[in-house]
Amino acid sequence: MFTRQQYSAGINYTMPFLWVNNNDYESVGREIEKIKESGSNAFCVESRIYEEFCGAEWWKLMDFIVGKAESLRMKVWLLDDKHFPTGGANGAVERNPQLRPKYIVSDEVDVRGPVRRGKVLLQTRPDARLYCAAVLRQTGNETFEYYKDVTDCVVDGSTLKVDLPQGYFRVCAVSVCTGYDESGVMIDMLSRASVRLLIDEVYEPHYARYKGTCFEGFFSDEPRFGNGVYNGALYRGGIYGGNAGEKGLAYNWAEDMGDCLARRAPGYERGHIVSLWNDVKGVSAGVRVAYMDEITRRYGENFSGQLSAWCRERGLQYASHII
């Protein structure tokens, strides 16, 4: 246990949030003093929500906060976005739609064979393009064997022509789309360029203004992939608790993800991607592990790794907790 004397000597292991949403300097100053009196020598500024974040009034308020902290020999951290959760990049993603995250979703229909010269009308989305179509043969209650890739049998982007033998089958059409979660347009955690928007919009201007002061670093608040159940837009239902195999779940995607899965999962072929949603014998386990390993690696390199490296190079601290 650390004593009040140790905290007063400059040992900091806590940094409570200082929520700011207006220009009441007197109240902000009083809250900073109370934080100091509690034994904490650091705090983290959070916009909740300060509409002019990174605007003229914001800089006046931050100048006051940093000045007050220096007078009390305190350290200042910043929650690194306009609002919770980290990922909006202060609205920069909306201005750069090409850097929005991509997702894959699967539309499925169960069919009883035999079927000859059958046609299946695929669900189409205005923001989506077909990645692949595949057929699974049902072997039990929601268990399947991989049957075949039928992407080449799709005509006009919306109609699948297919012949099927005796049995029960599931036809899956996987599309790549863009979407929104409940928090708005977010950066793409699989894209280094997309994450860079956060640095350019928030990190760079704060570092330039407060370099050499008591400004300590940045804190990312619950950054996430933001994927959920897809119904034309992503909603909270699966954002925090989604699991591989969950029906309707949207999975984060990158243009080269298929090639990466082929390297990670022996025997992988394009149509195997449907095993992210379905229990496919001899396929699902390998594909799901390969997929999670790949997106975890990219998240670490592009988000946490890029931000922390940027901070280290400038003598700043970086912290986060991740959903």
Annotate each language-model stretch with its function.
Residues P16, V20-S47:
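N-terminal cofactor/phosphate-binding cores enriched in small/glycine residues
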Residues V76-G87, E216-E222, M292-I323:
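Aromatic-lined carbohydrate-recognition surfaces of secreted/lumenal glycan-active proteins
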Residues W19-S27, R48-K60, I323:
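Acidic-and-aromatic substrate-binding clefts and catalytic sites of carbohydrate-active enzymes
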Residues M1-Q6, Y13, S27-E37, G55-V289:
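Mature extracytoplasmic enzyme cores
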Residues W19-N21, V185-M186, D293-I295:
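Second-shell loop/turn segments in exported
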